[in-house]
Each structure stands twice: as structure tokens, then as C-alpha cells.
Amino acid sequence: MPDWLSALLITLLKAVLVALALLTAFAYMTLIERRLLGRIQLRPGPNRVGPMGLLQPLADAIKSIFKEDVTVTLADKLVYTLAPILAIGMALTAFGGIPAGPPGSLFGTDPWVYNLDAGILALLALTSMGVYGIFLGGWASGSKYPMLGSLRSSAQMISYELGMGLSVLGLLMLVGSTNFLDIVEWQAGPRGHGWLILFQVFAFALFMVSSFAEVNRTPFDLPEAEQELVAGYLTEYSSIKWALFQMAEYVNIMTASALMSTLFFGGYRGPTFLEPLIPGISSWPLVWLIAKIAFFMFLFIWVRATLPRLRYDQLMRLGWKLTLPLALVNTLVVAAVLAFVPAEGLFGIPRLWLLGAVSLLLLLILFAASDAVRGLWNSPALRNEEKRVPGRPLGGD
């Protein structure tokens, strides 16, 4: 067998395994989310199907498959059908670029589907393409509520994609690479400097807020706001097409969790301070990556259970007036520290720890000025009554 063919078959096999793992995780994440929401809301949650409700995802899958697939009369049939496929396809493709271990650690092969030098840039591009599925689904439904939901999703993606990209720019300047393996090894490899959360906590806060907005989760779930848009872009979808959109949303949550774990918490590398207790524990790549992803997925569920939904005007102001300028400030601060502070640091403080202190100070200033900052995105725009043109009275002349 030619080398190129064997490499292609191995890549396809890894892609299938990643897809199966993600879809299985999606099924049980829905169960875990419903059980956790039940505990938070002082109710049991789903616990009837199978032992302790463990077969509930199977029951949900059977129900979705055998429900009637209703198609709207005015829908563009081809685009209406392709939209959920595009959404789940982009979500699965994006996750394939996250490394689950060092090279050759998966039965002698590399534990990723693809590895690009511009890894973080490619992944951000793929995640932003997922909004095409949402927009096309809303547009092709031939109804006003899905159209409004898809327009909201497009505006939301544009607003927070810029802040997300700028928030990691400082991190990339520190590491000097956009490759995920280089980022992980810079943090926790043999010559690791420490997790980037220690030096870029301000950037992490901005990235986390942008991630919540990118995956359309509470408090940023405006595209499918039930009280305003029935179900948003999902209004005219049912059966397996609706399930595909739900899969895409949860896979995007897993991708965002894996991104935060890889960029700021060492990815597949564990903490080295546990080595004296359990030798080799920091070198369990898959275990540590899954544990970190699970923590952030729990955070998504916790936020959904506790925070209310923002208004649409608040959402846009938060993205353009707060997240984007602060991400730009963080980028300029990192550039200034790297340009003007010597590598050995100042006053006996290493440059990295000095940058970490500045980043923490920026976050504390933001919290201290929270009341003033909230006014940037919470207060509605007021009309100038003096310049207001009087309207024509109702009922004619």
C-alpha cells in the first residue's frame, strides 16, 4: 500500500473516531445538562428511562429520528436541508484540529485529525463559518421569526469574532507561534513557562465571554430567544434536522471548551506539582484534556442556570463598546511589555510574571469600575427630544 494511501486511511479513521466520540459526548451532555439544571432548580430531572435515566439520550434519539419531518411550503428545499448539515460539518471539522496528546502518543500515530502551522487561525475561521448554516437555515425557512434569528446570529458572530481574535493575539505574541502543539509545549512541556492563564488572565476573561457569545449560549442566546422569536432560526425545523442543529451547538461548546483548555490551561499536559505524589501523572494527555473540557462544559451549564438573557442592544454594546476595545488594550499592553521590558525583567521580577501582574491589575480595575463599565452597554440610547420631528396625528387630517 502506498504511503500516501495509508496516511489518508489513518486520517479518515481518526476523523470517524473523533466524530463518533463527539456525537456520543453530545448525547450524554444533554442528559448531564438536564440533570444539573434539575439539581440547581430543586427538581430531579430525567431519571425514568433506564437505570438512573442513563438511557434517556437513546430515547431522545429515537424520538427525533421517527418524528415527522415537516417542510415549510415556502421554504427553499435544498438550502433548508443543507443548512443543518453545514452547521454540524463545520463544528466537527473545527474540533479535529485540537491535539489530544504529543506526537505519536495514540498507538504510534498523532492524536489529531489535522495539524496546521496556523492552527488557531484556521480553527477560528472554521468556527466562524458555522454561522452560515444558521443564517441559511433561517433564510431558507421562508418565515419571519427564523429570518430574525439568523440575522441576530450573523450580527452576534461578527461582533464577538473580532474580540475573540484580538484577545488571543497577545498570547500568540508571547508564544511566537499559532500552532497548537507549540502553544501547549510552551506552557507545560519539558521547558514549560507555566500555564498562560497566569500571564494572560485578562485575555482569558475576554476570550471566555466571546466564546459564550460565539456558541449562542446563555446569556447570549438571542438567535433562539423563545420569548421573542418562538425558537429563532429553529422555528421551522423538526425531527432529525432540528437534532443536527442541536448537535452543532453542543459540539461548538466542546470546541470552545477545548480551545480554552489548550490556549490557557496547558491543553493535554497536566500540572507538574502532582508528580511527587503520583509519578507520571502530568503525562496522561487524554485524561487531562477531557477533565479540562468537562470543567468548562460544566461552566457553560452553570451560567445557563444562573444568568438571565441580555437584551439585543446590550449584546451589541457589550461586544463593540467593551469586549473589542479591551481586547485591543490587552494586545497593546503585551506588545509594550515585550518591546520595552528586558527579558530578565525589572526589579528582580521576571518579564512574564510582570506581564501577569499587569494583566491581573487590568482585570481588577475592570471589576472595580464595574458600575461605570456597565453603563457602556446597559443604558438604552435616548432620543434627543428637542430635535425630534413631530409625527402626523393618527386618524388623518
Swiss-Prot record:
UniProt similarity note: Belongs to the complex I subunit 1 family.
The protein's name in its UniProt record: NADH-quinone oxidoreductase subunit H
Any one GO cellular component localisation term in the record: plasma membrane
Annotated compartments: Cell membrane
Keyword Translocase in annotation: yes
GO molecular function: oxidoreductase activity, acting on NAD(P)H, quinone or similar compound as acceptor; quinone binding
EC number: 7.1.1.-
Cross-referenced PANTHER family: NADH DEHYDROGENASE SUBUNIT 1, NADH-UBIQUINONE OXIDOREDUCTASE CHAIN 1
Subunit note: NDH-1 is composed of 15 different subunits. Subunits NuoA, H, J, K, L, M, N constitute the membrane sector of the complex.
Entry annotated with the keyword Chaperone: no
Pfam families per record: NADHdh (PF00146)
Reaction(s) catalysed by this chain's protein: a quinone + NADH + 5 H(+)(in) = a quinol + NAD(+) + 4 H(+)(out)
Domain of life: Bacteria
UniProt keyword list: Cell membrane, Membrane, NAD, Quinone, Translocase, Transmembrane, Transmembrane helix, Ubiquinone
Chief localisation class: membrane
One GO BP: aerobic respiration
Membrane topology annotation: Multi-pass membrane protein
InterPro entries associated with the record: NADH_UbQ_OxRdtase_su1/FPO, NADH_UbQ_OxRdtase_su1_CS
Membrane-spanning ranges: 7-27, 78-98, 120-140, 164-184, 195-215, 247-267, 283-303, 322-342, 353-373
Role this protein plays: NDH-1 shuttles electrons from NADH, via FMN and iron-sulfur (Fe-S) centers, to quinones in the respiratory chain. The immediate electron acceptor for the enzyme in this species is believed to be ubiquinone. Couples the redox reaction to proton translocation (for every two electrons transferred, four hydrogen ions are translocated across the cytoplasmic membrane), and thus conserves the redox energy in a proton gradient. This subunit may bind ubiquinone.
